[in-house]
Structures are given as C-alpha cells and as structure tokens.
C-alpha cells in the first residue's frame, strides 16, 4: 500500500491541471466516454486499461480524485446487488457536477459483450474501464466487488471489500470519507 501511495503522489506531482469542464452524462443504454476522468499527463505504463466505449486508454496510476473506483464483473452476485445503489448515487448533484467522480472497472469477463451489456441493462451512466488481462489484480486484489475512495491528492482514503448491502451504507461512506452531504 505504501508503494501504491508513493506512485500516486509521484503521478500527482507530475500532473497537469484540469479544465474543470464536464462532458455531458451518457444517455441510458449508451456506454459512457472516459473523457470526464481527470488524469495526469505523465505517468508510467504500469496499469493501462481501455475505456469500455473504445475511445481511450487510461493508466490507473494517473487518475486524480476525488473519485470513487468500483471494481466489478457482470457475473458477480455482489456486484449485481450493489449496482442499483451506485446508479442512485451517481444521480446525486455532487456527481452530476463533477465534484466527485465515479469510475467503474470491469474485470474477468469471459465474453467481450458481457461488460457493455451489464452497463446498458443496469443504467450505469458513468465511465468504465475494462481489464482484459487481469493486471488490475496487482492493485485491487483478486476479488470483486471492491470499492476505493481517492481524495484530491490521489490517496486512497477508504477501501471497501465486498458489496455494499444498502444504499444508506454507501451514502454514509461517501459522506464520511469525502465530507459531503448527499
């Protein structure tokens, strides 16, 4: 974890500034673009993943916060159970304004269409990356779901292993770790 923090700090020191402009939210049934995710301009190629809309690649270590990163898979029972809570959370004005961002990472799919179909059928209108070769396990570990909260400096301020069991549990974590009122 210390090595991860050092990498994140290094990436942030090398980062540029965001314009603060937010692209429009994707319509239901559309795979959203990853353009709204703030990233550093210079970073190593340690963990590069493709955006599920096919528009770009993003190196995980270049992602800036504040952001919630939810690692999921379409076949995962816990992921299916908690996804409505994330859909509801993303509708909150704090996320719509870009004050806090949400990023999904789809892992361990057997079929290339599974992740995009899951996103569309569940109304997941935030950006998603796909890990097609399981390299994300080096950072996030082997199990799903797992959710990370990163602060403005890119530091992990909270890690939740397993599914959120209620909307209130997820909301309470967001309010506590990002010091916001939803």
Language-model segments: what does each one mean?
Residues 42-44, 63-64, 97-100, 142:
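Extracytoplasmic
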Residues 117-124, 130-182:
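Thiol/disulfide oxidoreductase modules built on the thioredoxin-like
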Residues 80-122, 132-138:
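Structural microenvironment flanking redox-active thiols in thiol-disulfide oxidoreductases
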Residues 46-67:
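A short beta-strand-turn-helix
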Residues 71-73, 105-108, 131-133, 160-162:
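Active-site-proximal beta-strand/loop segments in catalytic clefts of secreted hydrolases
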Residues 1-50, 172, 182:
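N-terminal targeting signals for export/organelle localization
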Residues 68-69, 102, 147:
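Hydrophobic beta-strand anchors of alpha/beta hydrolase catalytic cores
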Residues 65-67, 72-75, 143:
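Short pre-active-site segment immediately N-terminal to redox-active cysteine/selenocysteine motifs
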């Amino acid at each position: 974890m210390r090595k991860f923090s050092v990498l994140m700090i290094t990436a942030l020191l090398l980062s540029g500034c965001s314009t603060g402009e937010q692209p429009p939210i994707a319509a239901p049934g559309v795979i959203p673009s990853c353009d709204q995710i703030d990233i550093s301009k210079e970073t190593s190629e340690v963990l590069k993943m493709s955006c599920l809309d096919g528009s770009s690649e993003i190196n995980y270590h270049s992602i800036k916060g504040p952001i919630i990163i939810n690692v999921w898979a379409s076949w995962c029972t816990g992921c299916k159970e908690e996804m409505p809570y994330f859909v509801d959370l993303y509708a909150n004005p704090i996320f719509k304004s870009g004050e806090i961002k949400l990023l999904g990472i789809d892992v361990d799919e057997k079929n290339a269409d599974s992740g995009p179909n899951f996103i569309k059928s569940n109304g997941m209108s935030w950006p998603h990356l796909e890990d097609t070769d399981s390299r994300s396990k080096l950072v996030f570990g082997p199990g799903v779901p797992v959710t990370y909260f990163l602060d403005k400096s890119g530091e992990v301020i909270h890690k939740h292993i397993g599914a959120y069991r209620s909307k209130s549990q997820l909301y309470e974590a967001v309010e506590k770790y990002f010091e916001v009122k939803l």
